[in-house]
Every structure is written in structure tokens, then in C-alpha cells.
Amino acid sequence: MRSISRTTFARAYLAITFFSVSAGIAAEPVALRVESFTVLPSTGPLAFVEVENRQPDPYRGMIALKPPEGWRIVPAEREVVLAEKETKRISFAIELGRNAALNSYAVEVTATAGDTKVVRQQNVACASAPYFKPTIDGNPDEWKDAIGVRFTEGGKRTELRTYWNRRSFSLLVAVEEDTLIGQRRSGAFDGVQLAISPADSRTATSPDKVADRYEFLLAWTGQGTAGKCFRLAAPETQLATTQNNRDLSSLQYDDATVAVTRTDGVTYYECSIPFKPMRDRIRPSEGREFFLSVLVHDPDGTGIRDWGKTAGLWPWQRNRLAWSKWPGAKWGKQPPYDNKLHWGLCASKY
């Protein structure tokens, strides 16, 4: 029996609701977001809060992070001083934390300046890849020891699981969808688009800049379990180039291994990408942090599912230049969110 089944999806859907509450966010003096943990809470990591000054004047306030019940975080609050439009990461140490089976942690962050208080509630996940080398054969049974990150869009569920070893980075994306459309010469088709970026990178806002990311597209060929990987961007790729619908055959990346299967209404995209071309910017080692985000393309169903939305990026962090265009994609009215979401490499989930 497959370890990531439709039943598992149903239980996760009932037990987890990712949410964010911050009324009138655009009018508030600061914006708040708790980042995903990059190692398991039980190991005592740091929790990071992003604070952005949204007003034209300097901001000085106190930031408090309320963890799940039974946890202990220090300090209780920290002062932040921000210049106009400045953003800072504020760290809190998790002295006592517990791992949740469904990898969902309810937190609340508060910014207080005088009589003005901003509150945001989120459910955050641990986004980290344990050390293991899976066989890329379309069978997800080997992925039970990976850390599952789950989200729901349009009533359909998606789960991400990752592994790493010294030679490769591996990814399993389980997509609940009504039908699977394989790659074809014309018309929209299903796929998974992922962006991997160094921890010191930033997405530019001008097309004359470079991509500064490694970006890939996974798709089913329409035959058996065969899948293809296309390399849409490398760090030196001009962003203007990424906004053209280039011929995918010229972008096929044969160094990656891909398998695609479908069982009980769930499509499984399984892929292994070599670290060698990325090693100069992302060195594979325990404790390494980098950026990873995923778009799921379901053109005849939910449309685009964006991990950045679930991870709590702010509405103004949508950026068309963060993702490459490609023939067969069906984009929504709004651009997708930025691709700079924290991810980590760890030894094990135990």
C-alpha cells in the first residue's frame, strides 16, 4: 500500500487549516510573517519572524512570538527598529518544542508600538530535507521518512517531500487532481515547476537582471511512468529570457531523473536533480539553508497552486519575474508569489 495515499490526504485536510489573520494588512504600520522552520522543532532551532515597515516613517516596536501550547521560546519579546520601508528578520530561540505528526504548527506574532498593535496568526511547517537517496521509480513508499509539507488549493491537496544526499536533491510532489494531462505540442498540460535558489539570492524586479536561481519543470510524457525535466533557468539566465515561451525541447534536462505515476486520484511526481551544477552556490551539507518553492499546474482543475501563498508571503510579494513562462502553462490573472521560501537540509526526521 502506498505510504502517501488518498486516505492520508483526507486526514491531513481535516486536521490542518493553513491560515493567516491580519485585518487591514495594507493599512497597518508593519507586516509580519513567521518563516517555515528549517529543522525539526524538537531539535531546538531558531524561529524567524520577518517584519516590514509599511509606513513612510521609522518604526520602533516590540515583537512577540507565541508558540504552540507547551513550547518555550526565548526571549519573550524583542525590540525592532526599522527605517522607512525596511525589512528585518527577528530570531527567537526554541528552548522546548515538539514535533507534530502532520507538520503543522499554530503560531501568533504580535508587533506593539505604543497603543498600536498588529497581530498575525499562521500555521507554519518544518520545510527540511532529510538525508537519503530514493529510487526514482514512481513508487512513493520510500518517502515515508521524508518530512511532508501539505497545502490545499481549490479543495485539492498537494504534498511536498524532499530528500538530499551528497550527489543529488530529490523531490516528491503528490497532487490530488481529477485528471492528468501529459505534455503535448499544443494546449495546456499538467506539471510541477520548482525554483531552487541560494540563501543569499534575491528576485530582481527588472527584466534586465539575471535569474539567480535554478528552475525546473517536471511533466508526464503521456506514456507509462516516463517523465521529463526541463531546466527553465540558471543563475546567469536573463530574466527577460524567462518571460518568453521558449521551445521546451531545447530546455530538456537529461541529467535529472523523473517518474510520474497516478493512483486513486493522486498524481505522484518523483524527481532527482544533481547537485553538481548547483554546488558552487548551494553546497550539500547538514544544516544548509537555501530557498525552494513550487508551483503546481493543474490547468483543467484548480489552476496554479502556489506554495508561496500557503507559506504566508505578503500580497505585494507577487512577482511575475520569479517564475519562467513556458508553452503549455495556463497562468492566472495575478502573477505568482516570489520563489524565495526557506528550506533546509537535515540528517533525519527522527
Residue ranges and their predicted role:
Residues 27-48, 79:
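Beta-sheet-dominated interaction scaffolds and their linkers
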Residues 11-22:
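Bacterial N-terminal signal peptides
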Residues 54-70:
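Short acidic, flexible loop segments centered on an aromatic residue
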Residues 1-9, 94:
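N-terminal secretory signal peptides that target proteins for export/translocation
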Residues 71-98:
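Intrinsically disordered, low-complexity Pro/Gly/Ser/Thr-rich segments with frequent PxxP/GP/PP motifs
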Residues 5, 14-15, 147, 165:
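N-terminal leader/targeting signatures
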Residues 34-38, 50-55, 92-350:
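Structural preference for beta-rich elements and adjacent junctions enriched in aromatics
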Residues 42, 85, 102-103:
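Beta-strand-connecting loops/turns
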